[in-house]
Curated annotation (Swiss-Prot):
Listed InterPro entries: MbnB/TglH/ChrH (IPR007801), Xyl_isomerase-like_sf (IPR036237)
Pfam families documented for this protein: MbnB_TglH_ChrH
PANTHER family the UniProt entry points to: UPF0276 PROTEIN HI_1600
Name of this protein: UPF0276 protein RB0508
Keyword terms of this UniProt record: Plasmid
Source organism of this protein record: Rhizobium meliloti (strain 1021)
Amino acid sequence: MTELTIHADRAQLGIPLFPAHPVDGLAGTSFKHQHLPAILADDEWTGGFFEVHAENYMGAGGPPHAALTKIREDYPVSLHGVCMSIGGPQSLDKGHLARFAALVKRYEPALVSEHLAWSTHDTTYYNDLLPLPYTEASLQRVAEHINEVQEVIGRPLLLENPSSYLLFKESTMSETAFIRGLVRRTGCGLLLDINNVFVSATNHGFSALDYLSDFPMAHVGEIHLAGHTEQQDDEGDLLLIDSHDKPVADAVWKLFDVVIALCGPIPTLVEWDSAIPDWPILKREAQAAQMLMDRHAAGLRQETLHVRG
């Protein structure tokens, strides 16, 4: 099917035609509707991208779609699902998957992602991203779910590593081994959430650097950064919560620096979903990520020049 035919089909269906904005090497932020006027009036914000939660746009129309359409006309968009329950024990919700696929078709996002987690059981929905045991049975089931999603949306899915607050005795492999197995079986890409790595490493007492060294970086198509909250568990020990309600912590920036030094610039999204600040604050976080990536990219270019010389 030619590009002209695809455009004609979209026009017949009343689907807007959007430009194919590149996302490689860019930093972005969560898109919040209250920021739209400030974004449209911001002459300094010219090169980033925005991420939206798919479930906020599963209605037929109205203000949410009008706002997202304006953003998509000028910027790359990352579509991030939070309710697919890919890690759950039961079949995927076909209606939810169809609505997700319709959004992919409508907005042609640069990036499409979901979580390695579950949120439904029987007819009950839990408003959270819950962990799963890392076993061969779980690996097979999650791989089947990923393959189903990829077949329906017609493109690879990026799968996000979770933040966790407990571990399962039933697990027979590490999280990174489980994720590598999913990549092998499905060909999916990965969304590396560095804040999640730091939160889980702190809560469970393992090395975030060791985790990253074992992570299949060659398959990472997007990075997430976010803020977290420090609490105490029942025994008085430090417990980190992936709260997305404050600036990125220094320790997470340092891990991000390590990853970009190793892999080069990867599309990076700063999440902020609670206690949402004014647009300039969120923009400043994304600009910090962009500056770090640009610095490493400049270093790589300089090294290439030296080698060629």
